[in-house]
Amino acid sequence: MLRVNWRMIVWLNKTNRKQSINKLSNIFFRSLIIIGCITQYSEALLIGQTLAIKGGTIIPISGLRVNNGTLLVENGKIKAVGSNIKIPRNADVFDATGKIVMPGLIDVMTYYGIDPKDLNETIKPITPELRIIESYYPFGAFGEGPGELKATDLLSGGITTIYIAPGDGTILGGQGAIVKTAASTFDEMVIRAPAAMDITLGSKPGKLNRKENRTPVTKMAAVSQLRETFIKAQEYQTNKDNPVRDLSMEAMSLLLERKIPARIQANGPGDIRTAMNLADEFNFDLIIDGGASSDTYIDELADKSISIVLGPVSHPYISGEEIPNLSEYPTVDEGLAGRLHKAGIKVAFGSFSYGLGSLAKGITGKWLLIDAAIATGYGMPEDAVLRSITLSAAEILDIDDRVGSFEIGKDADIIVLDGDPLSIKTWVERVYISGKLVHTKE
């Protein structure tokens, strides 16, 4: 008969239990170590994603100034703005005491980053199918890659967003684009493309056409060709089942469907009148670039809610450099911005500057603030002036859901200045784009 050694069984059970407990203890403590490491690693990841700029005077543009305020950024977006903001312990903190903190500036009209040879297509005078983003060369404008793409000369003036246009040497040059002035990749840099259709009235296209021995050379012929193009696009829209694609007509359809606006460069009274007539006839959204004589139609522009992008007024005061073909870029009188604003017209300033082989190499990022300061000196209210180079500019470009003011959820494009933004003595000390520090004053 088999005898059972109960004492041995009890001893074995106790031994197995101790071993099991030891194993569980080891697993438990190892888990704690792993959890601790994961927590530390997660906190490390958050550092740099959370930014707090505290102690400075914050100008949110969309609201009142906040003295001794805090601007909180999380994952590249504005998280909070105020005077009693709790700063997370894992945040990168910059003390801006004695500084001004405001949204990054927007230059609403440039040819920056485009080689002059790529600005104007001379094969034909009307080319709506062309996209300037294809000629955009950030490595040439922003410094050789690979690596960060930075427009240092623009960043030094606090400019974080620009509109780039095809050249104004043809009647209809093509589709413009909106880009940031610093990014890690090209795709990250682009905000919108296409963003508008660029058209030029005045004598400049005619001069180029004479040189190329082609038509049109007169304004009446140029406008006639524009109207023919619009009418052809309307007919194309009514026959969308046509199996033959037409890239130029597809591009024009974006205008007729009001998916993008037309930006018409018009300075003389007659050209501004023509621009408004075209917009009325073909029912597209209109932005006038240049607008040197826009106060001639100030009431009508206000009634039609047409925005004006004024050219630079500061260049003659500061630079001894002569701009070729000045007649094509007439100096806007210093009080025009104030008069347009008073009439209820949305106004922004554009540098109309070139990045590679500029016609006016003295025009860099600082000029946008200088133009704004001059407008203040001639009667435009300071808050309206600051808005014209931030939120109003963003509204004109239809990107105010992303940039232009410190509102929760918008891109954290931020500049820190060492004084009054409208003082010529003030310098931009730091620039952040999407919450990332991209420029510091040397």
Where are these regions (language model features)?
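Polyanionic/metal-chelating signatures
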Residues: 155-286
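His/Asp/Glu-enriched, well-ordered alpha-helical/loop segment
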Residues: 117-118, 123-131, 136, 261, ...
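Bacterial N-terminal signal peptides
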Residues: 29-43
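Metal-associated gating/positioning segment near the N- to mid-region
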Residues: 99-171
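N-terminal secretory signal peptides that target proteins for export/translocation
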Residues: 1-27
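Glycine-enriched alpha-helix->loop->beta-strand junction motifs that scaffold or abut catalytic
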Residues: 279-285, 302-309, 344-346
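C-terminal cap of metal-dependent C-N hydrolases
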Residues: 56-59, 395, 407-442
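Histidine-rich, glycine-flanked metal-binding segment
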Residues: 58, 62-102
